[in-house]
Each structure stands twice: as C-alpha cells, then as structure tokens.
C-alpha cells in the first residue's frame, strides 16, 4: 500500500531547516525556524528552568498519568498568568485552562472541538498567517478562509480593510487572531483597535480564538495581554491557545494550554467536558514534564522573578537586533525606509523579500528564510547581521 502513495511535500518551515542542516557552508545562517537564539547563536536553557528541574528531580516520585486536562497545579497557575489574577474572567469562575501538547496541540483541539460542536465549520485567519494554522484547521475538517491584515505599502496593519472584511463574516463563524507578535508580520493592533475588533466580533455573533504564542515577547506579560484580551468581554465566549515554547524556551517539551471562556461557570464546565472528550480521542493526557517545569516556576516566587528577568533579557535582545538590522540595511544601501522593522514586535519581521530573492539568498549566500520573506530576528546576532545585510543588498 505505501508504495502506491505520493510522497508528501516538505513542510514549508521545517523543510528549510532540513536543507540548512545539509548545507556545508561555514557561514550559513538559518533565520527560518521560530526559535530564540542568544548572541552566540545558541538556543539557551533558561537558568530558572534548570533550577526548577533540579527541584523536580529531588521531589518527583511518580510517572503516573495526569488527568485528561493535565495537572491542576499547572492549569491553576497558567489561568492568572494569561489574564492576571483579578481579571473578571478569572474571578467569576467562567474560564478554565487545560494543559496541551504545545500551542499546536491546543489549536488542533480547537479545530476538532469546532468541527464537532460549532454550528459553522468555517474559521477565518489573517492574511498572512502562520502557515501551519491552515494545515491544522483543514486537517481538523474546518473550512479556512482569510481576512486581510497586512498593508504591504506601509508595512503596517491594514486596519480599515480588515474591519470591513470582518463585518461581512456570517454570524456563527470563528475568527482567529494572533495575541501579540503577529506571525509572520510582527504587526499588532493598538489597544484601541483591539477594542473596536472586540466590539465588532461580539456584536456580530462571531467566535474569537486567540493564538497567544508569544506572551511576554512584545512589551511584557501584562502589557502583551492588555489589547488582545479585550476580546474577552463579560458574558461572552472565547478560546485562547497558549504556548510556553518561546517564553520559557521549552521548545522540545511541547508545553501549551487551551483556555475556554464561557458566559458563566456552568457553561465553561460544559465546554471543558467536551474539550476533554476531544482530547481523549487524540492523546488521552498531556506530556507532563514541561507542564511541571512551568508550574514549578510560576508557583515559586523566586523562580517566577528569575523567569521574568530572563524573559525580559530575551525580549530586549530581540529589540536590539531589530534596531541593528534596520541600521545595517540602511548602511549597506538596501533601498527603502527600514524603520518599520523597529516598529514590528516579537520574533519575526516581514522583510518584503520576494520568493526569487529568498532563493538567491539560499543558493548564493547560504542564508535560509521562509519563502514569504519572514525573517526570525531572534536568530540574528551581532556576528551575522553584517553578512546578512550584505547578502540582502546583493539580491535587492
């Protein structure tokens, strides 16, 4: 049977890293994968994670299954991390968090949950969006449609065009938003724009899903939620997918969360029961170790403070590399105003490079970026920025 199948195409992001790994050039640069790197080009293990793991090793006495929803110590710590402990959605008891295998796992659960229970099988995603959004939701059985988001002329948010498109979405459909640090553009709505988005979404009877994969990477934990959490209005529903790959640097632990917000506590209990039913049919219970690390850190004041300090260092390094990238592109004579790079937020910059230029960078300079021109700014270092910008100048 297998020999009769067609070979699946390489993943548009993971496949680039496979090519990079085969490249023998000593000066090769990989800016495709969404991972943070330090100034030496390494993806670090946070000190707070090391200390948490030491505590876990000293006290852990079982590897028994967790519950379908994961450990309560994780879920009870993550819920106020997302909202803040005094947020109405927390204090009212109308929200609940479930531990998932990464943010991708949370998104897939959302897809299956909506396919099973939503009156509409359509979800709307931004154009552009993270490429795996489409793969995840279509595989779950949803119809994926796009709403305009990015203005290529200004390298900013196409807010008016987006709002016009959102107004035309039929009631009952689901709309996915990026919580902060939009992937791939790095362009986020302002807090006032988030309020307008929220009023439109709930006024028109749409279901918001928030992909909150980069909390803490734009301005800070609380600051990054101030705008997007306006989607969580009293008495209204929402689904929030979280990831701890980036802000805890737990990439290979696959640690994420899914938070359901309902009209009241009784309704959220119904929703979580259905989510658990979906989970049981996929993986039964989440991998424990990453969640135990996160809960150990969040529930220990000293480790929590240390984590926030290390998160700040990562955030500031990315901001510094944005500034360096913009300045070096200008110094190398690359046409255009590059100040937009410093206004974008998070790990990614939508560079404006076209597919031909991306191929030239790979073939002529051993520089690997995603085909749509997305650059992982968090993988730029003071040592490779000059060579990167020189290569971009050569293909511009």
Predicted regions and their residues:
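Hydrophobic beta-strand scaffold residues
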Residues: 31, 144, 208, 238, ...
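Conserved core of the PLP fold type I
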Residues: 50, 54-55, 60-205, 215-217, ...
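Short Gly/Ser/Thr- and Asp/Glu-enriched loop/turn motifs at secondary-structure junctions
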Residues: 93-94, 341-346, 370-373
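Structural signature of PLP-dependent enzymes
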Residues: 272-290, 297-326
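Conserved PLP-binding catalytic core of the aspartate aminotransferase-like
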Residues: 308-364
